[in-house]
Amino acid sequence: MEQPSIYNYSWVDFVFSVIGVFTFFVDWGADVWVATEFYRRGDFFWFGVLVGLMVLSSVLVQMFSWFWLQYDRGLPDLQTGGGTVLFGDRLRLSCLLHVLQLGFLCRHISAIRQGFRVWWRKEEGSEYAFYLSHDLSMLRLIETFSESAPQLTLMIYVMLRTQRARAVQFVSVAASTTSIAWMVVDYHRCLRSFLPDKARQGWASSLIYFLWNLLLIAPRVAALALFASVVGGYLGLHLLLLWLVFVTWAWLQRTHFMDSPGGEWLYRATVGIIWYFSWFNVAEGRTRGRSAIYHAFITADGAILLVTWWCCREPVQAEPYALALLLTLLLSYLLGLLFKSLYYCCFHPTLWRPPAREPGLPDDLPDADVTFRHLSIQDGAPASRPLNRRMALHAADFYSARTS
C-alpha cells in the first residue's frame, strides 16, 4: 500500500520536539521548586505527598517506555533505520537509564536527534521521527493525568485549607489546567495523523476539542479539591473505589494496546487513573454510548462531591464565594458537555471499515466517514515502512465504526 503524506516531517514538527524537551525540564524544575517551598515552610506532609506523586508518575512513565522499548526490539526496520531510542540497542545501559528515571528524557533527545537529521540534513527517515513522536505523545498524556492533574488538585486543596492564595498561585492553577487540556488536544491531533489528510484536525476542531476538555476537566478537579477540603483523607478512598470500577470497565472492554498481558494490565490501571479526571476512549466501536455512560457516572459522582462539600463546609470561611463557585462549576460543566456534543456532531471523523475490500473506494468520502490509512497493519499485513502499530491500532479503535 502506498504510504501517505504523514511522513513529510517539517520544521514545525522539529520545533514541537524541541518544545517537548523544554517543557520536560520546566515541569521538572517547577515540581522541585514547589516541593522545596513546602519543605522550607515546614509542610512536611504536603512535601511527602508531592514527592510521592512525582515518583509514582515517573515510575509509571518509565515502565511504559521500557515495555515499548522491548516490544520494538523485534522490529528490524526500526533497528536498522536509525529510529531507535537513544541507547535503546544497549539493553543493560537502557535498563539502567530507565531505573534512574531517565528513559523519558532519552526519548525526547532521540526525537530531536532524528528530527534534526530529517529536517536540517534532509536525510531519509521521516517515518522514524514520527514513530518516536507518537510514543512521546502517549507518554506525555500518561504523565499529565498521573502527575499534573493530581498536583493541580493538591494545589487547589492547599489554597482552600489555608484560606491563603497569592496571585501567582491563581495564575499557576489557570496555567496548569490549560496545560492539561492542551495535552489532551495534542494527543488527539497525534491520533488524527493516522487518518487521511482530509480528516486532519483543523484549528476550529482543535479549539472546540480544547474547550470541552478545559470546561470538563476544570470543574472535575475543583470538585475533588473541594471534597478533600472537608473530608481530608477520604479522597484517597474515593480514588481507590472509582479506580477499581474504572479498571474493571477497561478490562470488560477488552483493551489491546500493549503486546503482553502484564503490559496490558498496566495500561488498564493507567486508564483507570485517566478516567478519574477525564474521558478517554480505549476500545473499538462507536464511542458515544460509552462516553454517555461515563459522563452520567462522573456527573453523579461530581454532584455527590459538591453536595458533601456544601453540607460540611465552614459557612464563615466559605460563604463569601461558596454559591458563586458552585454556580460557576455547574455552568462550566454544562458548557463543556455542550461543546463536546458540538464536536461529535460536526467535527469527529468516523473510521468506516468496509466489510470485504478496500480498493476502489471513492475519493470523496465526507469527513464523518473516512477510511483508516493503515488498516492493513491492523490485519497483520506487512508494511514497507515502519508504523507505530500500537498508536495506529489505538487510533483505529478511537475512530472506528464497524459495519455489518
Swiss-Prot record:
Per the UniProt record, one Pfam family is XK-related
This protein's UniProt keywords: Apoptosis, Cell membrane, Membrane, Transmembrane, Transmembrane helix
The protein's topology relative to the membrane is: Multi-pass membrane protein
Catalyzed reactions: a 1,2-diacyl-sn-glycero-3-phospho-L-serine(in) = a 1,2-diacyl-sn-glycero-3-phospho-L-serine(out)
Looking at the UniProt entry, the stretches that span the membrane are 14-34, 44-64, 167-187, 206-226, 227-247, 263-283, 292-312, 319-339
Q: What is its main location?
A: membrane
Q: Does the keyword Membrane apply?
A: yes
- Tell where it localizes: Cell membrane
Q: Which GO terms describe its cellular component?
A: plasma membrane
Q: Tell me the protein family, please.
A: Belongs to the XK family.
Q: What is this protein called?
A: XK-related protein 8
Organism (species):
Tetraodon nigroviridis (Spotted green pufferfish)
